[in-house]
Every structure is written in structure tokens, then in C-alpha cells.
């Protein structure tokens, strides 16, 4: 029994280390497959020996439970807000005031990026995660412990057994924000207005399994009572936090004077659009903790820190029209067309209005002057209406009575749904958008069929559903303007080749609502073929890790549809692969790590990656000293130069194939 306990503890430490490498350092040293194997082994042991379970095990970051509400908790020390400024003059006044109060000619400052997320305070006892509290009103916050445990960059055990309270910011990366909103709009859910709202809405979920799926992230920047750890400056504290295993923002800098602060602010004003998280300014802190104590604080904010905010990326323009777009699931999305404006160096003339409820809430009309802002510094969005500029000639934007494409009926699938959909199952626009996913690299990967060809094929009524693509003939394609004999032959060759597509990518191509690449892979591995998947019950699906009630319901509904059954039968008759192949594996590449750069001739990157992993090797997204080979295709990127500097062996695609066959 002692050996079992030791093995569980060993696995926890190993997984925690790999979590730190992946989520904090962004430098993994094992493949996803190896990581999943370790985690699965730990889950099995904890289930088999529940007396050795721990609330701070890495297994607590997956799955989740439902609570009835959040308990109110008082902070050990208040979480104060910051005074802020938007201009250089006031930041110089702040510097002069600090120097005057301290009676010094110069003061050192730490400049940190001001992450626009949700502030959190986290307490550890003997290195073990104990409690997380939201900022709330600064005095009392909500106990959000279970939800914060699901954030992969927040350690459940520290590298050293300190009892410590730290503070930081929880945020949703822009890529995750865009991904969520895309799915939300496709499924008729309310999208989030910006990444901050997305983080706030997620962290307040009563079901922590939802938090686990939304991939929130964090930066930790503050230690309560730093003198307890012999720390004298904020700069030392940031380094100390890194050593404990926290994710600390690497963009922070140390400034000796106010000119350095202003230069950094100007630099980040321009560069913030390149970040994968939303920042709205800098936080300027006096570096020396002794000086911070002397300066003290008011009832609302510390005197030793200030937020130096960026100017808003917001401009006024006039809406000249509203376009109605139909997605693959039939959802009708209104898009505002407005007079072009330059928004942070980009000419913008359109922005999604999400849904008709959003339009009604903001009372947006054609002819209105509105403010356009970049949500997260990236996505143009209508944020408010300038109602005082109305003339009375503005036109209300009404919910359409029929589909703007096919004139079919429109409505909601359920009473609670926000989205308005085209209810015509044969709407050509729905088919066009679905086909774009079907032929994409993440699905059947049929090159030569782009958006324009899809539009022409559907408009010519050559296909009525996605399965019809496998029944196209040279005669059919000859009717499409712009396609010569060579192009037709190439397209048909690609269609034939795509019949061997792995099951997980076939599932992506089916376009099941709420089922993306990751879920498709889980389903393929679990059910092995389309017949078993199509007959899976809700109860079977809900037991699978990472498949929640909504996804399970969506899968069952999809396969119960008569049209789906017809499509599956047509795919079978066409000879499309509908089962997971058992791949023979070898250890030829065991212990070897590969990176890939440039365009490959015979295989896609995913195919090469699969071959490497099937033969015991690993694939890294970056080149490091641990990389053994770089496979270089045509037009290689920066990885090639780095590989040369590190003396990594560079091989061609042909060399790699010889290595495998040898």
C-alpha cells in the first residue's frame, strides 16, 4: 500500500511539473499523448484508492461539480483599486509627488501590463492550494475556489512549502474568446462583449466543469506581506513568484526614471494588438517595499501605484446598412455596414451585431451615429449609439420574416434561444457554409475547392448535401466557369483521396453542433466507428470525460435526424472511411524529438506528426536544444535559422521517409 501511495505522489509531482512547463513556461518537454497517459494513470489510481485522493491533485483540473452559490468571504487585507491617468503630464506629476514624499531625487519603478481581467486572491498553506477569493468590493469577495482550481496555469501545489497569499489577474486569451463567440453565434447563444466579460462570466459559473473547458489563464503579480519572505522589492517578488511555479508576465520592466515609464507606455500602446490577451494600460509601482510602507494608502487606493491607461481604441461613424448573414446551422447574424474609419491603423467598415436582441438592447438603427471599439484590441464592435445626433430619419432594424437567402421560414429552435434561424433544411447558404468546413484541413482536407467554387457548385444545384460532393463527375464540374480540365482532374483526385480521411476528421466534417476537433477525436477513440457513435445514448455520452450535457444532447439530436441518416448512408456507399483504423506502432523514433517548418510535398503537417508519434517520436511546435531533427519543407520559417544556430540536424521530407523505412 505504501508503494501505491508513493506512486500516486510521484505521478502528481511529474504532472505538476509538466503543467508548469506547458502552461507557465510554454515549453513542454513531452507530447500530449504522453501527458494524457500520465494523467489517465493517476485518475485510475485515485479512483481505485480513494483514501489517497487529494483536493489539490492535478486531476482536480479536469471534470468538475455544481455548487448552489458562492459564499462571501472577507479579505485578510483589502484589495484596493488604483488611481489612473491617461496622459504623460499626470504621470510626471505622480513621479514628482513620490519623490517629494520620500525626499529623494530618484525612485525606481516596476512597470507591469494592466491585464483587463478579474482580480483574484489565492491562499496557500504549506505549499497547498487552499482558497481563492474574487475582489468583490475590495473588502468582501466570493469564494471561487473550485473554479480557480480549473485554471491550468495556477498551481495546486507550490514548488516550496510556503504559507502565502498571492494576488493576480484571471483572463480569457483572445484566441479562446474568439473561439467561444464563434461557437456561441453558431449555436444561438449570447456571445460575450469582450474578453473581460468572458472571464467574469466564466469564473462565476456554478458548474466548474464549464470553467475547465473555457481555458482561462492567469498572471500573478503580488504577494501579501512580502517581508515574511525576506523580499525587499517588487522586482524580487516577481522573480520569487516565478520560482514558486506561478505564471508571471514577462513583459514587466524595471524603470529608473519617469522617461523610461513613458517610453514603455508608448511602446505598448502600439504593440498591445500583438498580444493574445487584453490590456488597457500599465500599472506603475514603486519598486522598494520600504518606500511603499512610507507612502501608505488612502481608503481607496495605494499612494505608491498608479494605472497609466491607454487611449481607447474607439471612433464614431455612421451605420449605412445592415447585412444579414446565414451560417451553416441557419443562424441569421446581422452585420453593421458603416462609413469606413481608421481604427488603430486598420480600415474598418463592418462589425457583427451578434443577434437581434443585442440590437434591441442598444437600440441600434440604420442611419445612427455609433461608437466602434476594438474588443480586446482586435475585433470591431458597436459599443454605443450617439442618440443626440438622431434626425428622426433613422430606420429600425427588424427581425426578418423569412430567410434573406432562400425566403424560407425563420424562427427559434427553443423558447430560450436568442438566435433567429432559417428553418429551411435545404437553404443553399447553410449548405455553402457547411461545405467550407467539410473541405477544410481540419475535416476532409479537399484542396482546390474554395469558397468561390463552393458557391458555384451549390448555385448550379450540383449538390444538395455534403455527401453529394463524392458523387460529382467531370461533366458536373465542367459546368463551373473558370475550371479547366486539369483543375477538374485535380479536384476529383483530391475528393477520391479524401475518402481515406481518419474518423475524427470525418466527424468534424459532419458539422455536429458544439462538436469541434478535440471532441471529434474523443468520440472517434471511444466509439471506433460511425455506427456505434450514431446509436450512442445520452447516458453513454454524458459519462465521457469533457462531454457535458449540452454536447451530449446535440450529438443525440444530430444522429436522430432523418437527413443525417441519409447523409451517412450516402457516405458509406461512396466508400468514405467511417471507422477508426488500428495503427501498427513501432519504436523506431523513440526518444527523438522533431520540429517541422515550411510546406511539405507528400504529407500535411498533421499526417507527418501522426507518423512520428505512431513510431514513438515526439513533435514540438518550437525548436530548442532538446530538438533532434528539423524537417524542412519549401519556404521554411524562422525555425530553420534557430536550428542552424543550435546545430540541430536539418532533414528534408525525403530524408525523414528514409529514416522511417530504414
From Swiss-Prot:
E.C. numbers: 6.5.1.2
Residue positions binding Zn(2+): 403, 406, 422, 427
Cofactor requirement: Mg(2+); Mn(2+)
Keyword Magnesium: yes
Annotated BRCT domain residues: 584-662
Role summary: DNA ligase that catalyzes the formation of phosphodiester linkages between 5'-phosphoryl and 3'-hydroxyl groups in double-stranded DNA using NAD as a coenzyme and as the energy source for the reaction. It is essential for DNA replication and repair of damaged DNA.
Keyword ATP-binding included in the entry's annotation: no
Family assignment from sequence similarity: Belongs to the NAD-dependent DNA ligase family. LigA subfamily.
Coiled-coil regions listed in the entry: none
Keyword terms of this UniProt record: DNA damage, DNA repair, DNA replication, Ligase, Magnesium, Manganese, Metal-binding, NAD, Zinc
InterPro entries per the UniProt record, alphabetical: BRCT_dom, BRCT_dom_sf, DisA/LigA_HHH, DNA_ligase, DNA_ligase_AS, DNA_ligase_CS, DNAligase_adenylation, DNAligase_N
Binding site for NAD(+): 32-36, 81-82, 112, 135, 169, 285, 309
Residues annotated as catalytic: 114 (n6-amp-lysine intermediate)
Reactions catalysed, as given in the entry: NAD(+) + (deoxyribonucleotide)n-3'-hydroxyl + 5'-phospho-(deoxyribonucleotide)m = (deoxyribonucleotide)n+m + AMP + beta-nicotinamide D-nucleotide
The protein's name: DNA ligase
SMART domains named among the record's database cross-references: BRCT, HhH1, LIGANc
NCBIfam families in the cross-refs: dnlj, PRK07956.1
GO biological process: DNA repair; DNA replication
Gene Ontology terms: cellular component: cytosol
MF GO annotations: DNA binding; DNA ligase (NAD+) activity; metal ion binding
